[in-house]
Amino acid sequence: MIETTAGEIAAITGGMLHDCAPATPVAGPVEFDSRQVTPGCVFLALPGARADGHDFAAGAVADGAALVIAARPVGAPAVVVEPLGAQTSNSDAFAHDPDGSGAAVLEAVGRLARRNVDELAEGGLTVVGVTGSAGKTSTKDMMATILRTAGETVAPKGSFNNEIGHPYTVLRCTRDTRYLVAELSARGVGHVAHLARIAPPRIGAVLNVGTAHIGEFGSREVIAQAKGELIEALPDAADGGVAVLNADDPLV
């Protein structure tokens, strides 16, 4: 993540500082697992199936996190954002979020990630997006391996491709990063578009349109519409946008 301060994070996210000086430096990435915090990072207080990150926030700061992004005061340096209320999305990210606390934290980190990628793009960062019903992760891994021969490359670990994993990955980009390979998943129309707004791609690849999550989508045609949101997010060809499409799949 680009070096910043607590005050700047509050301004970017629309949150309020609690127990934290505006000039507090933040130089690390974001982390949602309190066991994985590193010095200077931002801990994300997210509710989960078995635990609530808010309960681990003070411990995360004690272990080195610079501050917490939370939906309520946590007794530690924090940027506090207002809960957004229950979400209607079928995303797994909101499965254990009855009051929208997690949604508010994710919206905040999405804004922070967008600021990060916008500033880095001015310095030459290229964002490559990949989506499809199957093969996203292996294709992402191959792309990243190839691009690393040309410069520092950031890509999701495993299948970090949703509302949590995507901004988490984006905020691992630094001023030395030349390429970001973003894997974009969806369980409904609008999901890919949302992820693309966080890190606008210049190159986009749609691999295929299959039947994964067809119960949520309703038909392959709707899945095709959702995957096509990646291409809609690209700049015009005259401005450097590049679409890579699977000509063997008629729905692509």
Range-by-range predicted roles:
Residues 98-247, 251:
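Phosphate-binding loop of NTP-binding sites
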Residues 2-129, 139, 143-145, 149:
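Short, basic phosphate-binding NTP loop
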